[in-house]
Design a protein with these regions (language model features):
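Catalytic alpha/beta core domains of metabolic enzymes, predominantly
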Residues: 74-76, 87-124
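Active-site beta->alpha loop and helix N-cap motifs at the rims of alpha/beta catalytic domains
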Residues: 1-93, 99
């Protein structure tokens, strides 16, 4: 597992190698919103195209707490944001109501849904 500083170094190296030839989306998910915000701000500073985050994988949070976590990240930068739903690893499956709420934010540009089985995505 990488530290926040190591993750910053990796993100910077990827962006430098990608230049403007590729879209760079930096995953900023951490157990704490504070560290996620730190990574999101760094992603913005290196010129990343977007940020993405899962809910906390350690703490099993209710939807309103996940919403606060994601909104804290979103509000910390001008980067577009991609919700990452991977319930088999996080213990949190994005409820449709929260998805609808989050989708109203113009910075939310998409969702990476790794839910299994994949046909469950039809609900979104």
């Amino acid at each position: 597992m990488l530290s926040v500083e190591e993750r910053k170094q990796v993100a910077a190296a990827v962006k430098e190698a990608a230049g403007d030839d590729f879209t760079v989306i930096v995953h900023v998910g951490c157990a704490s919103t504070k560290e996620s915000i730190e990574l999101a701000k760094h992603a913005e500073s290196i010129g990343a195209d977007a940020a993405s985050a899962v809910p906390s994988v350690y703490y099993h949070l209710p939807p309103q707490s996940v919403e606060m976590h994601w909104n804290g990240i979103i509000d910390s930068t001008n980067l577009p944001f991609i919700i990452y739903n991977i319930p088999q690893l996080t213990g949190f499956n994005l409820p449709y109501d929260l998805f609808k709420k989050m989708a109203k934010n113009p910075k939310v540009i998409g969702i990476k849904n790794s839910e299994e089985p994949v046909y469950n995505m039809e609900r979104y």
